[in-house]
Amino acid sequence: MRLIPLLCIPGVITSCQVREHEQPNIVFIMTDDHGYQAISAYGGTLNSTPALDRIAGEGVIFRNSFVCNSISAPSRAALLTGKHSHANGHTDNRQRFDSSQVTFPRLLREAGYQTAVIGKWHLQSEPTGFDYWNILPGQGSYYNPDFIEMGRRYRQEGYATTLITDMAIDWIRDRDKSKPFCILVHHKAPHRNWMPDTIDFDLFDDPDFPVPGNFFDDYEGRKGAELQKMSIFKDMRMASDLKITGTDGDSITQSEKDYISYLEKRLTPQQYRAWQNEYESLSRSYNAHPLTGDSLAIFKLNRYLSDYLRTIQSVDRNTGRLLDFIDSAGLRDNTIIVYTSDQGFYLGEHGWFDKRFMYEESFRTPLMMRLPQGFEAKGDIGEMVQNIDLAPTFLELAGVSPPDDMQGMSLVPLLRGPAVKKWRDALYYHYYEYPGEHDTRPHYGVRTDRYKLIHFYGETDHWELYDLESDQHEMKNLI
């Protein structure tokens, strides 16, 4: 007589279905402040990102991917919970994440996944829902970073992006192979102050990047955009941001003192020598021919982008290493690879660096996926998606029903292909942090395919409306 497995009897059919359709592994790679303009798969011409392009080329690329609050900690909380900031309670960078909340890693772990997070966490609380965690405290350091591994703090010599990738590969190699896994590989790069690996110092030498058409924006009719302190010309620091010292002649500013002290304490002697060789010559060259006005603004843009893109080069190189390992380990067919950033970033548009605003460059974020076998979607996906969608997506892929209070929409229907008949027609955004760094005023808004409506509130009561078809750079407020 043939025995029927207990798990397949009525009442527990869900477990049987999950066994029949193997749960995919999840590798979730996220960077900090990586603008889509600096990924060649998105049509960017500033740099080449072959490994990131490989994810898009072998899978899908979302052309309209957005965040719900363009600042680090709230964005991470939204990703974990699948909820907007007002619903998960984490509205700005100054708060401590309520780790008692339901998150997708916790639910995956309960469903039998082995879970890990390695790299940047930035939520002021210890990770929960993970079998293993090894995180950077706070913002972390590019060079010889401190890590907190399951409560134990230590310092590791090396470059953060490479170290995080090494740790991720080691964890995947040594995991419990009887279980599906989910690992969050979260990089510090390319966050300010853009400290490249010494092996990338030869890239983008003597740069002459294209200047955005609205680099010298006067913000006419856009009070919300005018009231900020994120100007490359006015607010970017010569020493710690651009690595140019000695601009005050024989005197040394406090900013320069702090910058030099940090380097001396953090870098090894070999790293420090390489750093000095690179940036002292740049400082001498600048100080021999100091600039003012528009020429100085463009110099700062080039200097900023050079180091920003160098840090991305390390991300791309190490992402390629991780992809190669996954393929060589025989995991490709049943692993989804996701690449995104916690938000977008300004690369000179409107004269800015940083993020925070609902304008396109910081509202948008890259999102690319290489899919497991059985998914038909390929190439471009044009529907509007948001970072709160990733949590329910991961859960549905694992055969877990998302909680009813998750506000995101699972992307699985888009991944199965062909295009879905019905999808959302608008997105909600809300930035809260004020007063705060860069003085960006709080605002909320709604975006459709064609229009964007923004309300700046508090000290400033100001409305803006943009027609994104005729004004893609958001220069003409229709109100």
Predicted regions and their residues:
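Sec-dependent signal peptide recognition
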Residues: 1-7
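Formylglycine-dependent sulfatase
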Residues: 2, 16-457, 462-463, 472-479
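Residues forming the ATP-binding cleft of Hanks-type serine/threonine protein kinase domains
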Residues: 469
